[in-house]
From Swiss-Prot:
This is Protein Hikeshi. The gene is hikeshi. One of its GO terms (biological process) is cellular response to heat. It is found in: Cytoplasm, Cytosol; Nucleus. Acts as a specific nuclear import carrier for hsp70 proteins following heat-shock stress: acts by mediating the nucleoporin-dependent translocation of ATP-bound hsp70 proteins into the nucleus. hsp70 proteins import is required to protect cells from heat shock damages.
Length: 197
C-alpha cells in the first residue's frame, strides 16, 4: 500500500503493519538521511474520507523513540517529500504509536503511517521545518537577496560632486544597479529557474 524512498537507497515497499491502521518503515543509519519520500503504491487507495498521517521517529539518548508528525498523504496527494535532517534532536509531538512495542535500535529511525479520518488529520499540525523548500520559498529567498544587495549597494551612493578622484577605484552608476535589479526581478517572475541556463 505504501512506499518509502531515501536518496541513494533502494525503494522500500515492505512496511511492517503494526496495527490494523498503522504501518512502519525502518530507516537504518538514519543519521545520514536528509530527506524522505513517502508515497502510495497505487495498488490500494485509502478508504473514502481517509488519509495517512506520516510520522518520523528517531531514538533519543536513552533509546526511546521520539515521534514527530511530518505531514500527510491522501488519495488526492499520494506522495510527499519530507526534510528530516533538522528533526534528529529535540522533543516529539503527540502520535498514535506510543502504546505499541516497536523495537528500535540506536542507529535505526522509523517512518510511521497512521490511517486516519481526513477531518482528524486536518486538526493536526505537522512540524514546521519538515516541509521541503518549494519554488515559492526559493523565489522569496532570491527576492530578499536582491533587496538586500540593492539596499547595500545604494547605501554607498554618492553624487559626482562628492566623489574623490581615485584612479585605482572603479565606480558603477546606481542606475545600472537599479536596471540590473529590475531586470533580474522580471526574469525571476517569468521563470524562477532562468539562472540554470
Amino acid at each position: 500500500m505504501f512506499g518509502c524512498l531515501v536518496a541513494g537507497r533502494l525503494v522500500q515497499t515492505d512496511a511492517q503493519q503494526v496495527a490494523e491502521d498503522k504501518f512502519v518503515f525502518n530507516l537504518p543509519d538514519f543519521e545520514s538521511i536528509n530527506h524522505v519520500v513517502v508515497f502510495m503504491l497505487g495498488t490500494v487507495p485509502f478508504p473514502e474520507r481517509m488519509g495517512g498521517s506520516v510520522y518520523f521517529s528517531f531514538p533519543d539518548q536513552t533509546g526511546m523513540p521520539v515521534w514527530t508528525l511530518l505531514g500527510f498523504i491522501t488519495n488526492e496527494k499520494p506522495s510527499a517529500i519530507f526534510k528530516i535532517s533538522g528533526l534528529k534532536s529535540g522533543e516529539g509531538s503527540q502520535h498514535p504509536f506510543g502504546t505499541m512495542n516497536l523495537p528500535q535500535t540506536p542507529s535505526v529511525a522509523q517512518i510511521g503511517i497512521s490511517v486516519e479520518l481526513l477531518e482528524q488529520m486536518a486538526q493536526q499540525t505537522p512540524v514546521a521545518n519538515a516541509a521541503v523548500s518549494t519554488v515559492d520559498s526559493f523565489t522569496q529567498f532570491t527576492q530578499k537577496m536582491l533587496d538586500n544587495f540593492y539596499n547595500f549597494a545604494t547605501s554607498f551612493a554618492v553624487s559626482q560632486a562628492q566623489m574623490i578622484p581615485n584612479p585605482s577605484e572603479v565606480f558603477i552608476p546606481s542606475n545600472v544597479v537599479l536596471k540590473w535589479y529590475e531586470n533580474f526581478q522580471r526574469r525571476m517572475a517569468q521563470n524562477p529557474f532562468f539562472w540554470k541556463t
